[in-house]
Regions:
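Positively charged n-region of N-terminal signal peptides that target proteins for export
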Residues: 1-6
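Well-ordered alpha/beta subsegment
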Residues: 117-119, 123, 128-132, 140-143
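Sec/Tat signal peptide C-region and signal peptidase I cleavage site
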Residues: 20-24
Length: 165
């Protein structure tokens, strides 16, 4: 199974948790707080004849929900759904791409401007990462893990008006 994840269905929603203790991260997410409110809304990238759109709901009930679609012309070529939540002191990024089974990634060491989620047993990608560039710009990437196996694929997103997408 070669699942390729894109974009901010890159739950970068955990990027701002870095300076917050794990116990505060749990309670913030569990009570519906938004530790990364900047991610809520819509992000997009366009190029190579395709459009990738990401939409994120603010945290409620202990989770943030995200979804993505990639279109080429009038055809949806890829889609995915993400659930972001704290399980104990671990931040989980649960993603379902197309008709593939759900894959769970766990945050390794989020900081104030970057988060990396990892699943060393998954075929590809093994890591999903995000870096906040500015309030309206986000870089996301996937790769084959710390060992450098497999390609590193990057995505540059800009914030867009959800109503106009």
């Amino acid at each position: 199974m070669r699942t390729i994840l894109r974009g901010v269905t890159f739950g970068g929603s955990l990027l701002l948790l870095a300076s917050v203790p794990a116990s505060a991260q749990r309670s913030s997410v569990a009570t519906g707080g938004s530790p990364a409110g900047w991610l809520a809304g819509c992000w997009a990238l366009e190029g190579n004849g395709r459009i990738v759109e990401e939409s994120w709901m603010p945290a409620r009930g202990g989770v943030m929900l995200g979804m993505s679609r990639t279109t080429k012309g009038d055809r949806v070529t890829e889609h995915e759904f993400v659930l972001l939540r704290a399980v104990g002191s671990i931040l989980e990024y649960r993603v379902r791409t197309g008709d593939q089974p759900e894959v769970v990634f766990r945050a390794t060491a989020p900081s104030a401007s970057e988060a990396v989620f990892e699943n060393p047993t998954h075929d590809f990608p093994k890591r999903v990462g995000y870096r906040l560039v500015s309030a309206d710009s986000l870089e996301a990437w996937i790769d084959g893990g710390a060992e450098g196996k497999g390609p590193k694929i990057g995505y540059g997103y800009h914030r867009v008006d959800c109503a106009k997408r």
